[in-house]
Design a protein with these regions (language model features):
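Glycine-rich flavin
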Residues: 1-37, 41
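Generic beta-strand structural signal
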Residues: 3-5, 19-21, 29-31, 47-51, ...
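Glycine-rich beta->alpha junctions and the first turn(s) of the following alpha-helix
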Residues: 83-176
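Short solvent-exposed loop/turn micro-motifs enriched in small/polar/acidic residues
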Residues: 14-16, 79, 87
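Short beta-alpha junctions and helix-cap segments that line functional grooves
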Residues: 36, 78-82
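Fold-independent oxyanion-binding glycine-rich loops
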Residues: 7-10, 36-37, 54, 68-71, ...
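A short core secondary-structure module
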Residues: 39-77
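Helix-rich catalytic cores of soluble enzyme domains
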Residues: 31, 37-40, 53-55, 129, ...
């Protein structure tokens, strides 16, 4: 089974701290979710989805997190992912069109904003680790390429390899 996360929304800089999608409560205790989610990796192929929306039916809004089961009528995957080098992830935009979560599929309901709720904290913590690992890998590879490049290039002025230039060595040391 493939589990996807539909958290990010267009133009929503609150991310996990508040949704612009709607979570409409149903009489049976479940919710219907409406709105757009972006960068939903493997949305075309997922069996289950963790997502959230805002329930504004009470005195104070609540962020409602739930397991959702995609279907053709209420879960539309847009064919809009075309980022060079990342095509395989298929991180398309998804339109939630009343996708239903029964009461037992509701993971948590929390006030919008920073939270130590285990669901919110768990998603946030793992995302930050994955994001940091990605940028660490990019930086490490850039440093490796820089080191290799200065060994093979030479100064026109004195034919010395750039690896012997004190300013270039200083910049590489700073990057490390």
């Amino acid at each position: 089974k493939l589990l996807a996360f539909g958290i990010s929304e267009p133009s929503n800089d609150r991310v996990l701290f508040g949704s612009i999608s709607k979570a409409e409560p149903q009489e049976d205790g479940g919710y219907r979710f409406y709105g757009k989610k972006v960068f939903l990796s493997m949305g075309k192929y997922c069996d289950k989805l963790v997502s959230f929306g805002s329930d504004t039916s009470g005195e104070s809004p609540l962020s409602v997190f739930a397991y959702l089961t995609p279907d053709a009528e209420t879960f539309e995957v847009k064919d809009d992912w075309n980022t060079l080098g990342m095509k395989a992830t298929q991180s398309n935009t998804v339109e939630l069109k009343g996708i239903y979560a029964a009461e037992e599929q509701i993971l948590t309901k929390v006030a919008p904003g920073p939270s130590f709720d285990p669901v919110v904290f768990g998603i946030f913590a793992y995302f930050e680790i994955l994001l940091a690992a990605t940028y660490h890998g990019i930086g490490k590879r850039a440093l490796e390429i820089g080191i290799e490049t200065v060994k093979t290039r030479h100064s026109v002025s004195n034919d010395a390899p750039y690896s012997q230039d004190k300013n270039i060595r200083w910049r590489i040391a700073e990057a490390a």
